[in-house]
Regions:
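Conserved Walker A/P-loop ATP-binding site and its immediately adjacent core
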Residues: 17-24, 37-60, 230-233
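Conserved interdomain linker/interface between the two RecA-like ATPase lobes of SF2 helicase motors
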Residues: 150-226
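Conserved helix/coil segment N-terminal to the catalytic DExD/H
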Residues: 72-102, 113-118
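Pre-Walker A adenine-sensing motif
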Residues: 1-5
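Post-DEXD/H (motif II) to motif III coupling segment of the RecA-like Helicase ATP-binding lobe
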Residues: 109-171
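Walker A/P-loop
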Residues: 7-28, 224, 228, 252
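Conserved Walker B
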Residues: 103-109, 235
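Conserved helicase motor "Helicase C" RecA-like lobe of SF1/SF2 P-loop NTPases
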Residues: 229-253
Length: 255
């Protein structure tokens, strides 16, 4: 209600991953279309896969809950246009700044990045809504610059206590790796430094030993898992090592 008052034309939804940020957006869009079925909407997402998933979700909810045909898709003339940051950063000037009544930014912690910020500030929507689980950036840039003042109303711990999310079980494995010399650029670690430091045969073997002892013992029920590696090459090395130890594994990447 606060975001809908005349003096508030922007807002930010800050909720842990898996607690329904996209569902909140879709529910709000449905309510707005009930009031105005000619509304033009832009939803910005970071990846092609998220674009595909969001198109499916929005279409499904609109078909089931709204008795008005709305053209939803990735085409420029869509009534609800769902596109990636990169696509819109290339083509945003092909649009009029007043083309969209409502703009939503998924993974909105990226909104203060120069390229995406330029896109957002080009348009003049009646409503700008950001969705994120991580409103605190490592470079300390404030999302309030884009979305105005906001409050985080549900923490990860609270979501678990309310049975919205499953409890987290964490196991910490000590190794002799020293990360103090790995450079950090304010956003992420340098990949070259990580590869020199983290990729070590002894450490890779430790991963295998821990998995064999606690997760893939023959007396235990089958478990599946995901291992994040430093690089594609590292992923292939770890997969080969697991396979050599009779643990079913496959290396996958975005390449």
């Amino acid at each position: 209600a606060r975001a809908r008052s005349p003096e508030h034309r922007s807002g930010l939804v800050v909720l842990p991953t898996g607690t329904g940020k996209t569902e909140i957006l879709i529910a709000d869009l449905i309510e707005q279309y009930k009031k105005n079925n000619s509304l033009k909407v832009l939803i910005l997402v970071p990846t092609k896969q998220l674009k595909i998933d969001t198109i499916k979700k929005v279409n499904h909810r609109f078909e089931n809950e709204l008795h008005v045909k709305v053209f939803i898709g990735e085409e420029k003339n869509s009534q609800i246009l769902i596109q990636t940051y990169s696509w819109m950063s290339r083509y945003y000037q092909n649009f009029n700044s007043l083309d969209f009544d409502y703009i939503a930014v998924d993974e909105a912690h990226h909104a203060v990045a120069p390229t995406l910020q330029k896109v957002i500030q080009y348009f003049n929507p009646q409503m700008l809504l950001g969705l994120t689980a991580t409103d605190k950036r490592l470079d300390e840039k404030s999302l309030a610059e884009i979305f105005g003042k906001y409050e985080s109303n549900l923490t990860l711990v609270e979501a678990i206590k309310q049975d919205i999310l499953a409890p987290i079980k964490a196991f910490r494995v000590k190794s002799n790796i020293d990360l103090s010399e790995v450079r950090f650029n304010g956003k992420d670690y340098y990949s070259t430094d990580l590869q020199k430091t983290v990729i070590a045969p002894s450490r890779d073997q430790l991963i295998v030993d821990v998995l064999k002892k606690y997760f893939v013992d023959k007396t235990m029920p089958f478990k599946s898992g995901l291992i994040f590696c430093v690089s594609v090459v590292h992923a292939k090395k770890v997969a080969k090592l697991l396979q050599d130890n009779e643990i079913s594994c496959k290396a996958v990447s975005g390449n």
